[in-house]
Amino acid sequence: MSEKDQSVNNTEEDFNVETEDNQNDTNIENSVSNTDNSEANASDSENNSEESIKDEESESQDTKIKELEKLANDNEEKYLRLYAEFENYKRRIQKENQINATYKAQGVLTDILPSIDNIERALQIEGDDESFKSLQKGVQMVHESLLRALKDNGLEEILAEGKEFDPNLHQAVVQDDNPDFKSGEVTQELQKGYKLKDRVLRPSMVKVNQ
C-alpha cells in the first residue's frame, strides 16, 4: 500500500472516530436533556401533588369550619329557646304565687259567710226587753268588727238592689213586677253576695224586675 492510500485510510479512521465521538456527545447531551426533562416533570408532578394536597386540606378546613358554625348556631338556638321557656316558667310561677297570695283567704272567707248571714238574721229580730237590746247591741258590735276584719282581707259586698241584673254577680230567684224599677233591674236582695277582690265567692240572690 502506498503512503497516499495509508494517509487516506488514517483520515477516514480519524473521521469515523470523530463522528463516533460526536455521536457519543450527542447521546450524552440527549441523555442529560432527558434527565433534566424527567427531573422537571418530576418536579412539576411533585408541585401538582403538593397543590392538590393543599386544596384538599383547604376544602377539609372549610368543611370543618362550616360544621362548627352550624353547631354553634344550633347551640345558640337551643340556648335561646331554653332561656325563653325558663323566663315563661318564672313568670307563670310568679303569677301563680301572686294569685295564691291574693286569694289565700278564699276558703276561710267562704266558710264564714253562713255565720255572717246568721248574725244578720239575729240583728233583724225586734224586742223591747232591755236585756235583749243589750244583747243585740253586743251582737251588732261583733258583726261590725267581723266585717271590718274580713274587708281588710279583701272581702267586699256585692251591690244588688237598684242595680241592673248581672248574671256574673247576681242570681235571679224571683221575677218581680215593680213600676218603681226599670225592666232588668234588681228590685230586692234576698241574700247578700260577696266577692274576694275580683273573684265572686257567692252571688247575690235577688228579685229581678220583668
UniProtKB/Swiss-Prot annotation:
Residues 36-46 have a biased composition (Low complexity). GO terms for molecular function: adenyl-nucleotide exchange factor activity; protein homodimerization activity; protein-folding chaperone binding; unfolded protein binding. Residues 61-71 have a biased composition (Basic and acidic residues). Residues 11-23, 47-60 have a biased composition (Acidic residues). One of its GO terms (biological process) is protein folding. It comes from the Bacteria. Residues 1-71 are annotated as: Disordered. Residues 24-35 have a biased composition (Polar residues). Homodimer. Belongs to the GrpE family. Participates actively in the response to hyperosmotic and heat shock by preventing the aggregation of stress-denatured proteins, in association with DnaK and GrpE. It is the nucleotide exchange factor for DnaK and may function as a thermosensor. Unfolded proteins bind initially to DnaJ; upon interaction with the DnaJ-bound protein, DnaK hydrolyzes its bound ATP, resulting in the formation of a stable complex. GrpE releases ADP from DnaK; ATP binding to DnaK triggers the release of the substrate protein, thus completing the reaction cycle. This is Protein GrpE. It comes from Staphylococcus epidermidis (strain ATCC 35984 / DSM 28319 / BCRC 17069 / CCUG 31568 / BM 3577 / RP62A). The lineage of its organism: Bacteria, Bacillati, Bacillota, Bacilli, Bacillales.
